[in-house]
């Protein structure tokens, strides 16, 4: 839903005209590109004749629907990030393109330093095998923060509403982001938009979704921060790197060495990403 809402907001800001779920118009105008942003069930809503731009809120892997291009008149599939494109490319070749949705930089803004009362927001998005990772990853991070005298609070993916996250970001000076991998990573990008630098666990390795790995799909490398540069913060791959990574990261936070919001403004605004989406739409019209 966030992808759909932010795409619409971006299209509104650049003055683009569009229709929402107007299936009757699509049926009457079969030459017009149908942009199906949502999940695959929408593809079965009717017998499409329109050329379809599908994504970026798609299914997890092409093996879920290997005959998709034969079943429906899909011309291009959008995925949120580069590593996902590489995973899909052997199946659908050049029909796969990268498109990330934009971040609302007017809503996710930097708070005044005087509001910052907590050093670290520990963002827990561990999706699988959490019982194993709790004692060997999460608890050691807590211990490092305690030993370094840093105050912290925790937030867990799926257990908050956006406004709670936004409030937490306004009160925290930095964030530690824990996730096996991200296709885009809207939440950490919202933090970057708030000018909150991030120390991210980015261990690479295989795509770990247990519905696919290792019995159906073995793909590597993946990333937990697919949109990133040195302005955003720092990364560590394993817990034994944290002893050096944390103090270096914190020192740079204190000295103002990071500028994460600049990265978002340069790459992932609502307007920039909506314009990129229109480019994909027009590429089908011109084909």
Residue ranges with predicted function:
Residues 32-62, 76-78:
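Active-site proximal beta-strand in glycosyltransferases
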Residues 63, 74-94, 132-134:
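A short, active-site helix/loop in glycosyltransferases that binds the activated sugar's phosphate group
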Residues 87-90, 101-162:
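Conserved catalytic-core segment of nucleotide-activated headgroup transferases in glycan assembly
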Residues 235-282, 286:
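A charged, aromatic-enriched C-terminal amphipathic alpha-helix characteristic of glycosyltransferases
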């Amino acid at each position: 839903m966030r992808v759909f809402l932010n795409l619409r907001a971006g299209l509104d800001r650049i003055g683009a005209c569009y229709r929402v779920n107007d299936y009757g118009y699509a049926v009457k105008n079969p030459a017009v590109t149908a942009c199906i942003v949502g999940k695959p069930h929408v593809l079965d809503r009717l017998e499409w004749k329109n050329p379809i731009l599908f994504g970026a809120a798609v299914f997890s892997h092409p093996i879920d629907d290997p005959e998709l291009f034969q079943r429906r008149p899909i011309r291009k599939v959008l995925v949120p990030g580069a590593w996902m494109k590489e995973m899909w490319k052997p199946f659908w070749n050049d029909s796969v393109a990268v498109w990330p949705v934009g971040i609302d930089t007017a809503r996710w803004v930097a708070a005044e330093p005087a509001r910052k009362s907590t050093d670290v927001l520990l963002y827990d998005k561990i999706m699988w095998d959490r019982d194993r990772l709790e004692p060997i990853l999460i608890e050691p991070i807590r211990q490092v923060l305690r030993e370094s005298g840093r105050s912290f609070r925790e937030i867990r993916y799926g257990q908050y509403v956006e406004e709670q996250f936004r409030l937490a970001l306004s009160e925290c000076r930095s964030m530690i982001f824990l996730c096996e991998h991200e296709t885009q990573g809207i939440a950490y990008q919202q933090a970057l938009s708030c000018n909150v630098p991030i120390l991210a666990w980015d261990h690479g390795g295989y795509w770990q979704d247990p519905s696919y790995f290792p019995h159906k799909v073995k793909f590597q490398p993946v990333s937990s921060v697919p949109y990133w540069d040195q302005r955003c913060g720092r990364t560590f791959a394993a817990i034994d790197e944290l002893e050096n990574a944390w103090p270096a990261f914190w020192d740079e936070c204190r000295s103002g060495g990071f500028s994460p919001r600049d990265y978002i403004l340069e790459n992932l605004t609502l307007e920039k990403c909506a314009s990129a989406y229109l480019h994909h739409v027009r590429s089908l019209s011109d084909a």
